[in-house]
């Protein structure tokens, strides 16, 4: 299975993707598993974040979506959330700025009075063949958005989280099997996995759980926006299932980790990789 060669300008947009990703718009059915919860989802405009937002809303949660500047995608995601009868707050801005991370949480508390679920999902990457090709500012930005923002968001959110709340970090199969062309991204995803392990222990006494999801190759706007067209064409073909995953195929895992069903699940990393193992 392959996609046609295509290229977008970062950070990418859903509308230009062929084929269009499946976020569960027409398939996800909720059953009240997150009824009454308030969730913050970064990178919530598209890709995995959109699929999680749709699933959370259909499970009964209100949602704040943090995103950079992809307003069209964000508005479409918000429409799906509101169609489910839930509140959706949109907060654009750059998570590389610690002050903006704090502002995201402040706006969630203003809207909902608390944070029950924090999903740190926003990510940045670029493909480079050599370490000498990586600009210093690209290294810094990748770490700031992918890893440091997770720290700043969590630090700001914890005082507003009650026992039973959940923190979920989006890591990657790359934390175990790092492709050399994504060096800064690989580093951040390993860092998220380790941060989650520390948070699970640090926050246990507060009744707050921390877990991560390790996706394999998932068909999101980040792919045509950050990879050469020939890599886009074969994206996902290397895993045992022979295809990229769809965002909708990850959403149920994020729902489970946010739900009370996962009350004893903390410090875990769940792989959704199309058969590629993580250790």
Question: In which residue ranges do the predicted regions lie?
Answer:
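Substrate-binding pocket helix/loop in short-chain dehydrogenase/reductase
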Residues: 129-131, 135-143, 235
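Short, small/polar-rich loop/turn modules that mediate ligand/substrate recognition or access, typified
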Residues: 204, 209, 265-267
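Active-site helix of classical SDR
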Residues: 154, 188, 196
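Active-site loop-to-helix junction immediately N-terminal to the catalytic Tyr of the SDR YXXXK motif
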Residues: 29, 134, 178-187, 198
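The beta1-alpha1 cofactor-binding region of Rossmann-like NAD(H)/NADP(H)-dependent oxidoreductases
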Residues: 71, 92-105, 136, 248-249
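Short, flexible catalytic-loop segment of classical short-chain dehydrogenase/reductase
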Residues: 193, 214-225
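Short C-terminal tail/terminal secondary-structure segment
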Residues: 4, 17, 25-26, 128, ...
């Amino acid at each position: 299975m392959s996609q046609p060669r295509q290229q977008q300008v970062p950070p990418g947009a859903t509308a230009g993707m062929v084929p269009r990703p499946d976020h569960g718009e027409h398939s996800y059915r909720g059953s009240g598993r997150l009824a009454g919860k308030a969730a913050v989802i970064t990178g919530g405009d598209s890709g995995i974040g959109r699929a999680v937002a749709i699933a959370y809303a259909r499970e009964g949660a209100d949602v704040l979506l943090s995103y950079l500047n992809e307003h069209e995608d964000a508005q479409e995601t918000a429409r799906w959330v509101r169609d489910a009868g839930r509140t959706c707050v949109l907060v654009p801005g750059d998570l590389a700025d610690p002050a903006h991370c704090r502002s995201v949480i402040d706006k969630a508390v203003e809207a909902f009075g608390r944070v029950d679920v924090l999903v740190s999902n926003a990510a940045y990457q670029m493909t480079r063949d050599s370490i000498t090709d990586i600009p210093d500012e690209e290294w810094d930005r990748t770490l700031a958005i992918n890893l440091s923002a997770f720290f700043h968001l969590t630090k700001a959110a914890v005082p507003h989280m009650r026992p039973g709340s959940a923190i979920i970090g989006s890591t990657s199969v790359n934390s175990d099997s790092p492709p050399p062309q994504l060096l800064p991204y690989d580093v951040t995803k390993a860092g998220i996995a380790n941060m989650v392990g520390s948070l699970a222990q640090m926050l246990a006494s507060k009744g707050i759980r921390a877990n991560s999801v390790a996706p394999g190759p998932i068909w999101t706007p980040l792919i045509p926006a950050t990879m050469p067209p020939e890599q886009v064409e074969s994206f996902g073909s290397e895993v045992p299932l022979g295809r990229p995953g769809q965002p909708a195929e990850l959403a149920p895992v994020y729902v489970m980790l946010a739900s009370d069903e996962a009350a004893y699940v903390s410090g875990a990393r769940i792989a959704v990789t199309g058969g590629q193992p993580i250790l």
